[in-house]
Amino acid sequence: MFHYIDGGADDEVTLRRNTAAYEDYDLQPSFLNPVDKIDTRINLFGKNLDIPFFIAPTGMSRLFHHTKENAVARAADKHGTAYTLSTLGTASLEEIAKETDGPKMFQIYILKNRELTKEFVSRCKDANYDALCLTVDTPMAGNRERDKITGMTMPPRFTFKSLLSFALHPSWSFNLLLHPDFRLANVAHRVDALANSTMSLIEYVNSQFDRTVSWDDVAWLIQEWNGPFIIKGLLTADDAKRAKDVGASGVMISNHGGRQLDGTPAPIDCIASMREAVGNDLELIVDGGIRRGTHILKALALGADAVSIGKAYLYGLGAGGQKGVELVLEMLRNELERGMALLGVSSISKLSNKYIQKRL
């Protein structure tokens, strides 16, 4: 399970770069500014958040803890931030809507089955989701070699190798046995992808990705939804402009956590050019490589409106369920507040590129 969370595609160059790239930027403090009161609040897609980072969509959280996505949504709500549910979640979007009254997004794909895509839109409206987040960097699944090496399957299969690993982690294994239900909750009513033993979950998901999706399809989905709409997976200024032109509310600057095309730039390196291209007309969210509060600070100083975290909270979920996720959010918040004070900035709204410089 650890390698599924921790790994990336091919040689994992992009995976490593996502975090390492933050070291290329120096924060430029301005002292003798009052920082006795630190304000981390922001407004994103019309919703007030207590912190400028939120939960990114990650699939199949049941793999990592039996409390699955529900625990993560509760942790996000407790910290006053937004939660994003993946289409490939093991909790349904209706379940999550009942868990929290906080801001919620649903991550969606434009699938080969357009009726299923439209059905997701209708269900999100009925469940009062605040925004849609369309992932566009998955015309097919990336080549995640670590999963092949470790023999990763979803749900986990009982092999000699896996049984040995389960024996070394009795608490996780015990909870798996007590809570064996594993299903793609948002599509279970249409097709049980796990019932067909001749097709793995990865193969099923890959079969649903549509390589014909175009900007016209994005414009169609934006009209179908008619609300705050984020496009996830863009990395260039030109694509940011296209997103603006088709009516998106924001862009999530992301390379899928280094799990799709290996060799792409780190999201932090794309912020400045994308902000220059769209001005203040789009909300920009940075997704990828966030491990420290100072990483959040750097992304915001470069022009991002918010950041999203994925791997970081999954480590917490796997280790301790809801409490583990809460601890990760608390650690990041404390580091961010400390970083703001040491930078000489009392409010997120006061951050600008004068506080950051790329090392030559």
Where do the language-model regions lie?
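An N-cap/entry alpha-helix motif that binds or orients negatively charged groups
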Residues: 1-47, 152-213, 349-353, 357-360
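N-terminal capping/small domains of soluble enzymes
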Residues: 1-140, 332-334, 351, 357-360
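Alpha/beta catalytic cores of nucleotide-metabolism and tRNA/nucleoside-modifying enzymes
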Residues: 1-23, 266-286, 291-360
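Short, contiguous strand/loop micro-motifs
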Residues: 58-60, 80, 107-108, 204-205, ...
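Glycine- and other small-residue-rich loops at beta-strand/loop junctions that grip anionic moieties
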Residues: 7, 61, 65, 85-86, ...
